[in-house]
Amino acid sequence: VDRIPHMQVVAVCDRLFEEEGTFPDGVRYYQNYKRLLDEKLDVLIVCLTNDIAPDVTIAGIQRGLHVFCEKPPGRNMDDIARIIRCERDHPGIKLMYGFNHRYHESVQDAMRLIRSGQLGRIINMRGVYGKSKLITFNQLDWRTRRAIAGGGVLLDQGIHMVDLMRLFAGEFTDIHSFISNSHWGYDVEDNAYALMRTPDGIV
């Protein structure tokens, strides 16, 4: 936000704050997002655990705020369906998720090449995505608890690969997949595999 000249951080919220107050730079802080939403805001940035991010996103949209939310959109299809309904009920509001990989320079170069048709049409693609050492799936934290996270490495990191596949090839309609938690043994997947095909045959 600090890199965008016409944007200014007005207030922040974190459940770990012991009280409400104001930082020395004038930014106000809250423990409860509902108090934050009482502020005069234009944009809401949601960086929360997956169990509460959908509710906060919806609350922001209903307040008439543009919303940027970290991925994933939700823990399951019910979460996502609620957000879609809310967004459709507020057509003037912009909602964006943190699929930052599609803006990497190499990905943009690939998109230009695909659109140019220089190499012909895409026939198939293969993607492999490993976890970051910064993501602690091997420790018992919220990312290993299905009730909070909704899923494991596929939902948290593999979603980037799925997003890029959709960016390059379009929507997939025929999907065969399986997941396992055989490595760490927690309540979420630590390995995921999928074979996907678009209506026009890209695999």
Regions found by a protein language model. Give the residues of each.
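N-terminal Rossmann-like dinucleotide-binding module
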Residues: 1-24
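Acidic-histidine catalytic/liganding microenvironments
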Residues: 4, 24, 39, 90, ...
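Core-facing hydrophobic residues within beta-strands of well-ordered domains
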Residues: 7-9, 41, 122, 172
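Short, Asp-centered acidic motifs that coordinate Mg2+ and/or phosphate
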Residues: 11, 43, 94, 124
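Beta-loop-alpha module in the N-terminal Rossmann-like domain of NAD(P)-dependent dehydrogenases
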Residues: 27-86
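Glycine-centered short loops/turns at secondary-structure junctions
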Residues: 64, 91-92, 117, 201
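Predominantly a Rossmann-like dinucleotide-binding segment in NAD(P)-dependent oxidoreductases
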Residues: 93, 101-186
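Active-site beta-strand termini and strand-to-loop segments that position acidic
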Residues: 194-201
